[in-house]
């Protein structure tokens, strides 16, 4: 009731107002008056009925509406503005408040609804420019209400009409407010149309998700998204509870649930696709919604008010409702409004009319399009969008464009509206197949025309639209985007004639593109990594690089300011690209610092991050909507960086191959085949020529026309791959010649035409026109000729048609072709020549060949021509790809950045370098530095060393710190470069690697510059003589340390104050607190570098420090101080990292500590001391070696630096460490002892004394308390003491050192458990052996070293201590320890270690070896049980060695020791040991027999045959001169080696004599040794004396005879052992007998210089060997225990005695016979003592010899014994029988 009254009130008032108007009272308005009156009457009647309450249920609303609408329609058709305004106002209100819904069918037009008629009526009120301005405003309001009202629905043609009307009002209205309002209304309408479409899908999706049983929700009112008014509307509607009727009757008679939101479409059809309802929103309720009314009213008022305001402020489009990501930032928003007063010049674009009318046109293909939409709202949006696209394509008029012209304004506003639609596009629009297709087919083609417009506004809008497409639609527009870049943007940048304005706008656009990380990476992935696409990214960067470098600005007709602006923008783009790469790969970056990141400092990461986030969100939203909206969108291929990299490599190979082909085709083909990119078959090559468009068409033609067999085959295959089926001949020829340019040579053309003709006939075998292929061949040739004739400018007289027909007579198998046919060919060629393929590079001549443009006018003309060409190409390409689908990859992987950067780092570096070098503009410098920082970051992250080093070197170069030019040239940009370098070091330290070198070098030079700049004398060191502190003036400085800074001229003499002031000013900023702190932060921040980075950092810091210190006159220690600092900072790192750091720093300290400049070395050592103290404080766990590594530099310095000052300082440092940190030292003891080891051999008494004091303190005191910690270094301690002992200059120290070594033995003895429990990581020793390996072995080994190295007194002391230790602690030694020990002991006898000088060697053998030999035997005897099994053979071998030496004393000692050893231990010998012992003696005997005596002849001496008598005399003299006592003492029997007669003899003779002499001595000693071993303590001398006494007394009484049965080793030896000894004795005897008998040889020796008082002889050896032999045999002969051997003994005895007696008879010399006297006494005496039975055998053998002996003049004693012997023979053989026993001599009575 209330609603009806309200509506009636509206209508009544409006009708009354119309009637009251005086215009209506005119006659022509009678129908209007009548209609108004009828309507008023009806309303009154209706109200009366309602008042009486008798009213029936109201009729359907549309019947009433029909009645009420007629007067308004008539009013709108009137010519009176006031009447029309009133009518429009009422209609607007009725629609706004929902009183008119217009769903009723239009009675006047079948198939339409009333609302369509209402809207049409409103639209028709606009009659062009002359329409009243008030009416125009009312029309706008009414139409906006119609479109936005939630109560009515208008679609398709009607909605197009509303938009068209507003559009026309905007164009035609002269009122600025109306124009602006119309434009704002258009924007609002479009917003509503597209938002409704989006919301419908969302609503539909929500309803599908609802469970079937859920109760229906309140309908959703469609409204503009994001508008506060509409959000209020939604709230109010949500709060209200409208009543929903059960059913609503539709005009086609169907009934449907209003909740499902059915609406009727044009012609009553409601297409449904995919089962979705037609409408996603419910039919609005019939009830009046006061909230809705209020909102709609607000909207209308808002639109008008804001429009007026905007017009006044000359503002354009309202801000879009959604955030647009990185590409639509505020800075780059294109002002959509068109300045009415702006003047533009330029030639109109290519004119290609699409439609004659400047109106939007309804959809021609209505149903076909509709059938592909899921809802009518989508169709509405599509129609509006397509219309706007077509409007934007309309050409402008001829001549310069007029900003106020309808055409231009139409174009601009259409583009603005399109931009608005695209910027606010929702998921449906962005993904639905139809919209994507529309964008491809309409919008992109439109943009290809407008994108090269000479009108800046149009161009700018086109760029803005392209940006939006790139941001929101790139997934679908891969190929279109490529065309935009390739044909428009980059062409404009590359063309030298393009205007600054166009370049500026393009580069502004690129700035936005380059700021979107996703976009930048996507461009690279989708184009540069696509085999079929252009290298957009690479080309873009190269172009931007050229712009940034500011090349050829004068050629481009730009002012310097414009060029600079362009350069800045170019640089900004390049920097943005790198920022994007940094942003893209930021997850890989590890910032060593927490204070700041590169991103926060350098780039607007927030924007970039948000942009990327939005972009990702957009991609996600598109994906989510695609499943419900569209089935035709492109699915992205998988993002695999490795795959793309492979493709990129292939592409580069192909491009290189094409480049080669375009120079020399065969080379290109060969290269591609070698790389596997092209098959070997001719078909493959032919296909390649067809498909690859980048090939030079001329080269292709030349290649195909070549006469070689291979080329022919390719040409045949090429032609065979063409299909000419059912093609006209000329058309086929055109197709054929499209692929290449015909070569100039006739023969080549001939071959090509021949094959073409054959192929054409082959494809068209059914044709009857040509008799054979010959006809086709001739005709083809003639067509080529005709083309040349008709279209060549050189040909003046063109061929006529008749001439052409005549020329072709008789070519068809001697017949003619039809004249009509030839005529048509002529006409066709005349109209359009056969255009052969042009090479692409030549399409724009000025691009490749830079022309010098004479004037601005000429440049503009050229540019317009080029733009026209560009537009044609772009449009053609755009149309060609409008239906193509190419998969677009949305990049997600971080790894794309690496190949991207690798591709473009060089042009980037060129741009930044030239920018820094040539331009002093701070903004340019700032951009360049920012770019370099980003580039360094990327190169760092991806480990690209070459690239990283190049950029860091560029920074270093532009800091001027390493430049050779004068530093006074330093500018702000150089200061900023230094700051950038410092920042890079701070933020990218983890990745800098070798680039640290440049950075640290600059920091070093910076410090020098700061010091000089501030007038402070830099810390130079000039050795001991320091120069006076003060100014630099007059300072003579070496050139090299200033070479980098260019300070040579500044600091050398003669610098004036002005120059210095200038310099100080230029470097002043580098001394600012911020720079100083930043530099310091690099070093303090080194703690946050990772393990590898800190090593690189330290390594290069050390290298720079070495450079600083390299100056011989003025070394600097800045970096050295920093090394000390960072050592402090980083000491708390994990030990693994620290050890790697110290490996580098320690090595540096090694070098610095040995610096020839003492001040440097002192600083190094002192720094080392401080660091070491701090490090030692930390302590060390067992088995670690960090201290050892840390302290090693002390060791190195001590070893290499010979400066007493430094050496003394090192010792003092170490002593200080020992005194203060002894408790914390572990592995460091090794270094400490190593340092003292070096000091121990010094010649400086102070150094030795100080070192020894500390060493003594350690060994005697510290070891007491910290022995377990020092075990690992125990060996080093002993070695160190050994070195002190070996310093001959300080004997007292030596003796004390040996005492301390003895003291160390006490530690080992007292603490064996500590040694056993100690485990070391480098010693794989059994626990039982640790005491030996760690304790005893080092002590004994070092003592052996002392013995081997020192002088007599020290080595004797060492020897004594060594054997004392053995004797004292040997009981604790294991058997295998003794083996090691004796190896050490035997080193004393090692020939290699003996002194080389003969005298020293002799002394050594006589003293030390002698001493050692006896000591060995003592030890062996003491520990025989433990040693004999393992060491007896070694001892025997050593004794043998001694015996063989050329030292008489040592040889004697060897035999004596052997004797002592056997006598001392023989009782314990086993048979095996006796065996070994006897073998040893046998070996010694054999090796010491001087066989050379019998054969030797002096070199060059002739043999002299001597007179026999002379020999005899000499011999007699020789033998008589023997001093028996001397020979008994072991003196030479040959001659005296000290005799003067030796001096004349050569050294070799002397050596030989000495050797022979010693061998003889050894033989004699051995005989004595055997004698002593067998019979000790009885001696042969004693026995001989007894025999002599007995003979003298003429008795052999038993009383005088001494029993020796139980003495000596005889009883422990077997007969076999004794036989071995007997063999030795017999051999010795035989040799000496042979020598003594060889008078001639003895004479030779004597004459060769071996002459003394007599000739040499071996008489003593001869007699003593036989005597010993006889004693043993006779002892065995009477031994009952050896009865089983008596036979052998007897045989031996008989043989020996017989030979002896026989020899004696032959001796001529009386003295010789005298020497044998004792032998004969022994022989006869012993024989007399045997039993008669045995005596018989002997007597019978000896008898004849004894008889012979009788004739010699014998001594009485011998005669007495002989007498007894003969008597005994008489008795035994019973020759005589004594009458009584008293007659038998006493000596024989025992045998009697």
Swiss-Prot record:
Span list, region Disordered: 207-294
Post-translational modification: In vitro phosphorylated by PKA reducing its GEF activity and dephosphorylated by phosphatase PP1.
Keywords attached to this entry: Acetylation, Cell projection, Cytoplasm, Cytoplasmic vesicle, Cytoskeleton, Endosome, Golgi apparatus, Guanine-nucleotide releasing factor, Membrane, Phosphoprotein, Protein transport, Synapse, Transport
Region (DCB): 2-224
Activity regulation info: Inhibited by brefeldin A.
Superkingdom as given in the UniProt entry: Eukaryota
Disulfide bonds: none
Domain SEC7: 661-792
HUS, as annotated region: 515-535
InterPro entries: ARM-type_fold, DCB_dom, Mon2/Sec7/BIG1-like_HDS, Mon2/Sec7/BIG1-like_HUS, Sec7/BIG1-like_C, Sec7_C_sf, Sec7_dom, Sec7_dom_sf
Modified residues (Phosphothreonine): 244, 623, 633
Record-level Gene Ontology MF annotations: GABA receptor binding; guanyl-nucleotide exchange factor activity; myosin binding; protein kinase A regulatory subunit binding
One GO location term (cellular component): glutamatergic synapse
Official protein name in the record: Brefeldin A-inhibited guanine nucleotide-exchange protein 2
Record gene name: Arfgef2
């Amino acid at each position: 009731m209330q609603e009806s009254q309200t509506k009636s009130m509206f209508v009544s008032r409006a009708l009354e107002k119309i009637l009251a108007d005086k215009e209506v009272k005119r006659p022509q308005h009678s129908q209007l008056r009548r209609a108004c009156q009828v309507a008023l009457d009806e309303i009154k009647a209706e109200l009366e009925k309602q008042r009486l309450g008798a009213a029936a249920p109201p009729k359907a609303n549309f019947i009433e509406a029909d009645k009420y609408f007629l007067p308004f329609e008539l009013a709108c058709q009137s010519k009176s503005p006031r009447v029309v305004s009133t009518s429009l106002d009422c209609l607007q209100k009725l629609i706004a408040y929902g009183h008119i819904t217009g769903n009723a069918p239009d009675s006047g037009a079948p198939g339409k609804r009333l609302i369509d008629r209402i809207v049409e009526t409103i639209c028709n009120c606009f009659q062009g420019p002359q329409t009243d301005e008030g009416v125009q405003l009312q029309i706008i309001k009414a139409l906006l209400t119609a479109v936005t009202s939630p109560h009515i629905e208008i679609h398709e043609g009607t909605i197009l009409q509303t938009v068209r009307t507003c559009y026309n009002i905007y164009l035609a209205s002269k009122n600025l407010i109306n124009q602006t309002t119309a434009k704002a209304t258009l924007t609002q309408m479009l917003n509503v149309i597209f938002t409704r479409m989006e919301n419908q899908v969302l609503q539909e999706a929500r309803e599908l998700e609802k469970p079937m049983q859920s109760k229906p929700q309140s309908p959703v009112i469609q409204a503009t998204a994001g508008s506060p008014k509409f959000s209020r509307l939604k709230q109010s509607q949500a709060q209200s509870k409208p009543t929903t009727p059960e059913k609503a009757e539709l005009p086609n008679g169907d009934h449907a649930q209003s909740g499902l939101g059915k609406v009727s479409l044009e012609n009553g059809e409601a297409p449904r696709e995919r089962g979705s309802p037609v409408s996603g929103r419910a039919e609005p309720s019939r009830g009046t919604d006061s909230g809705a009314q209020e909102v709609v009213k607000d909207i209308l008022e808002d639109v008008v008010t804001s429009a007026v305001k905007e017009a006044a402020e000359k503002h354009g489009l309202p801000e879009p409702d959604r955030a647009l990501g990185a590409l639509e930032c505020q800075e780059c928003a294109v002002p959509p409004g068109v300045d009415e007063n702006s003047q533009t010049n330029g030639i109109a674009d290519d004119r290609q009319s699409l439609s004659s009318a400047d109106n939007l046109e309804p959809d021609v293909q209505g149903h076909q399009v509709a059938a592909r939409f899921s809802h009518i709202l989508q169709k509405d949006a599509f129609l509006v969008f397509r219309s706007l696209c077509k409007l934007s394509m309309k050409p402008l008029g001829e001549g310069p464009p007029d900003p106020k012209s309808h055409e231009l304004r139409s174009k601009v506003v259409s583009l603005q509206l399109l931009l608005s639609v695209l910027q606010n596009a929702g998921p449906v629009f962005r993904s639905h197949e139809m919209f994507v297709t529309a964008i491809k087919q309409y919008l992109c083609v439109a943009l290809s025309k407008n994108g090269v417009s000479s009108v800046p506004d149009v161009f700018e809008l086109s760029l803005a639209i392209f940006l939006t497409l790139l941001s929101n639609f790139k997934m679908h527009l891969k190929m279109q985007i490529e065309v935009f870049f390739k044909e428009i943007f980059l062409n404009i940048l590359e063309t030298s004639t393009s205007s600054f304005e166009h370049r500026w706008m393009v580069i502004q656009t690129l700035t936005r593109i380059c700021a979107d990380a996703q976009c930048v990476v996507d461009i690279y992935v989708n184009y540069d990594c696509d085999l079929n696409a252009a290298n957009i990214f690479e080309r873009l960067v190269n172009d931007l690089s050229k712009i940034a470098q500011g090349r050829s600005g004068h050629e481009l007709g730009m002012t310097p300011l414009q060029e600079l602006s362009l350069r800045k923008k170019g640089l900004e783009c390049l920097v943005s690209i790198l920022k994007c790469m940094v942003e893209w790969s930021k997850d890989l970056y590890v910032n060593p610092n927490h204070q700041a990141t590169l991103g926060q400092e350098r780039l607007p990461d927030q924007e970039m991050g948000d942009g990327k986030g939005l972009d990702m969100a957009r991609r996600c939203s598109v994906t989510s909507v695609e499943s419900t909206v569209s089935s035709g969108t492109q699915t992205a291929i998988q993002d695999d960086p490795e795959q793309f990299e492979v493709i990129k490599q292939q592409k580069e190979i192909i491009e290189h191959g094409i480049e080669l082909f375009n120079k020399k085709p065969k080379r290109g083909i060969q290269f591609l085949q070698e790389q596997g990119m092209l098959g070997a078959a001719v078909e493959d090559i032919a296909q390649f020529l067809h498909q690859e468009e980048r090939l030079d068409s001329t080269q292709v033609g030349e290649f195909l026309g070549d006469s070689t067999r291979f080329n022919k085959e390719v040409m045949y295959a090429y032609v065979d791959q063409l299909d000419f089926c059912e093609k006209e001949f000329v058309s086929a020829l055109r197709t054929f010649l499209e692929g290449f340019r015909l070569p100039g040579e006739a023969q080549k053309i001939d071959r090509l035409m021949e094959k073409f003709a054959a192929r054409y006939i082959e494809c068209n075998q059914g044709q009857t026109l040509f008799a054979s292929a010959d006809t086709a061949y001739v005709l083809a040739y003639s067509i080529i000729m005709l083309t040349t004739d008709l279209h060549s400018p050189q040909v003046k007289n063109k061929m006529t048609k008749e001439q052409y027909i005549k020329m072709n007579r008789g070519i068809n198998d001697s017949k003619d072709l039809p004249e009509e046919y030839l005529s048509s060919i002529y006409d066709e060629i005349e109209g359009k020549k056969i255009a052969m393929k042009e090479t692409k590079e030549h399409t724009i001549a000025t691009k490749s060949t830079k022309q010098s443009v004479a004037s601005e006018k000429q440049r503009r003309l050229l540019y317009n021509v080029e733009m026209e060409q560009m537009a044609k190409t772009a449009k053609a390409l755009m149309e060609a790809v409008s239906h193509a689908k190419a998969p677009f990859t949305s990049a997600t992987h971080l790894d794309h950045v690496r190949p991207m950067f690798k591709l473009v780092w060089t042009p980037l570096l060129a741009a930044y370098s030239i920018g820094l070098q040539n331009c002093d503009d701070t903004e340019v410098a700032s951009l360049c530095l920012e770019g370099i920082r980003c580039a360094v970051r990327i190169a760092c992250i991806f480990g690209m060393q070459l690239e990283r080093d190049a950029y860091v070197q560029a920074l270093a170069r532009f800091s001027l710190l390493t430049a050779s030019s004068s530093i006074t040239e330093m500018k702000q940009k150089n200061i900023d470069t230094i700051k950038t370098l410092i920042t890079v070091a701070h933020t990218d330290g983890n990745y800098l690697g070798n680039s640290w070198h440049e950075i640290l070098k600059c920091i070093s030079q910076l410090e020098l510059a700061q010091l000089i700049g501030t007038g402070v004398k830099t810390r130079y060191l000039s050795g001991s003589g320091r120069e006076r502190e003060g100014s630099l003036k007059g300072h003579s400085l070496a050139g090299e340390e200033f070479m980098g800074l260019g300070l040579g001229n500044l600091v050398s003499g003669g610098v004036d104050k002005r120059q210095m002031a200038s310099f100080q000013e230029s470097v002043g900023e580098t001394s600012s607190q911020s720079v100083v702190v930043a530099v310091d932060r690099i070093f303090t921040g080194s703690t946050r570098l990772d393990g590898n980075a800190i090593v690189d950092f330290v390594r290069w810091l050390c290298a720079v420090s070495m450079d600083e210190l390299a100056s011989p006159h003025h070394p600097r220690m800045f970096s050295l101080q920093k090394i000390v600092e960072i050592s402090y900072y980083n000491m708390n790192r994990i030990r693994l990292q620290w050890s790697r750091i110290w490996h580098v720093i320690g090595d540096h300290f090694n070098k610095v500590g040995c610096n020839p400049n003492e001040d440097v070395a002192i600083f190094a050592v002192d720094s080392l001391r401080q660091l070491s103290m701090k490090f030692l404080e930390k302590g060390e766990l067992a088995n670690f070696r960090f201290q050892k590594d840390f302290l090693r530099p002390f060791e190195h310095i001590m070893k290499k630096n010979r400066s007493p000052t430094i050496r003394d300082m090192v010792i003092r440092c170490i002593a200080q460490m020992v005194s203060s940190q002894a408790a914390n030292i572990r592995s460091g003891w090794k270094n400490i002892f190593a340092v003292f080891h070096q000091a121990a051999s010094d010649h400086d008494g102070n150094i030795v004394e100080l070192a020894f004091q500390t060493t003594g303190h350690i060994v005697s005191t510290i070891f007491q308390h910290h022995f377990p910690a020092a075990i690992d270094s125990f060996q080093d301690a002993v070695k160190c003491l050994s070195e002190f002992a070996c310093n001959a200059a300080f004997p007292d120290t030596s003796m004390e050192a040996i005492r301390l070594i003895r003291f160390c033995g006490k530690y080992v003895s007292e603490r064996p458990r500590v040694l056993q429990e100690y485990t070391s990581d480098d010693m794989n020793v059994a626990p039982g052996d640790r005491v030996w390996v760690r304790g005893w072995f080092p002590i004994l080994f070092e003592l052996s070293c002392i013995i081997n190295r020192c002088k007599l007194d020290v080595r004797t002391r060492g020897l004594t201590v060594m054997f004392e230790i053995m004797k004292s602690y040997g009981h604790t030694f294991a058997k295998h320890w003794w083996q090691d020990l004796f190896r050490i002991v035997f080193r004393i006898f090692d020939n290699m270690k003996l002194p080389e000088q003969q005298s020293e060697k002799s002394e050594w053998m006589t003293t030390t070896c002698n001493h050692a030999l006896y000591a060995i035997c003592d030890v062996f005897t003491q520990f025989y049980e433990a040693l004999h099994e393992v060491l007896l053979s070694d001892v025997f071998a050593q004794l043998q060695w001694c015996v063989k030496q050329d030292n008489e004393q040592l040889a004697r000692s060897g035999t004596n020791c052997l004797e002592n050893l056997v006598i001392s231990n023989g009782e314990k010998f086993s048979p095996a040991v006796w065996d070994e012992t006897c073998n040893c003696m046998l070996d010694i005997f054999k090796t010491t027999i001087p066989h050379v005596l019998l054969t030797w002849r002096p070199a060059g001496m002739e043999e002299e045959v001597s007179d026999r008598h002379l020999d005899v005399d000499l011999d007699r003299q020789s033998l008589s001169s023997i001093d028996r006592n001397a020979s008994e003492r072991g003196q030479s029997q040959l001659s005296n080696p000290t005799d003067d007669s030796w001096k004349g003899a050569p050294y070799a003779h002397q050596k030989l004599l000495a050797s022979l002499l010693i061998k003889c001595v050894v033989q004699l000693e051995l005989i004595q040794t055997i004698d002593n071993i067998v019979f000790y303590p009885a001696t042969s001398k004693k026995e001989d004396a007894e025999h002599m006494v007995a003979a003298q007394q003429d008795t052999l009484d038993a009383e005088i005879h001494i029993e020796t049965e139980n003495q000596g080793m005889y009883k422990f030896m077997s007969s076999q052992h004794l036989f071995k000894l007997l063999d030795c004795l017999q051999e010795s005897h035989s040799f000496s007998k042979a020598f003594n008998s060889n008078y001639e040889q003895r004479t030779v020796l004597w004459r060769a210089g071996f002459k003394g008082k007599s000739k040499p002889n071996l008489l003593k050896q001869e007699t003593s060997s036989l005597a010993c032999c006889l004693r043993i045999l006779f002892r065995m002969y009477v031994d009952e225990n050896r009865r089983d051997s008596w036979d052998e003994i007897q045989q031996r005895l008989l043989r020996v005695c017989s030979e002896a007696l026989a020899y004696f008879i032959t001796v001529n010399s009386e003295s010789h016979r005298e020497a044998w006297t004792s032998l004969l006494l022994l022989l006869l005496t012993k024989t007399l003592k045997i039993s008669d039975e045995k005596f018989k055998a002997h007597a019978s053998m000896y008898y004849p010899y004894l008889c012979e002996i009788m004739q010699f003049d014998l001594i009485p004693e011998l005669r007495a014994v002989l007498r007894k012997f003969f008597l005994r023979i008489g008795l035994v053989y019973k020759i005589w029988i004594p009458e009584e026993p008293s007659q038998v001599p006493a000596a024989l009575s025992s045998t009697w």
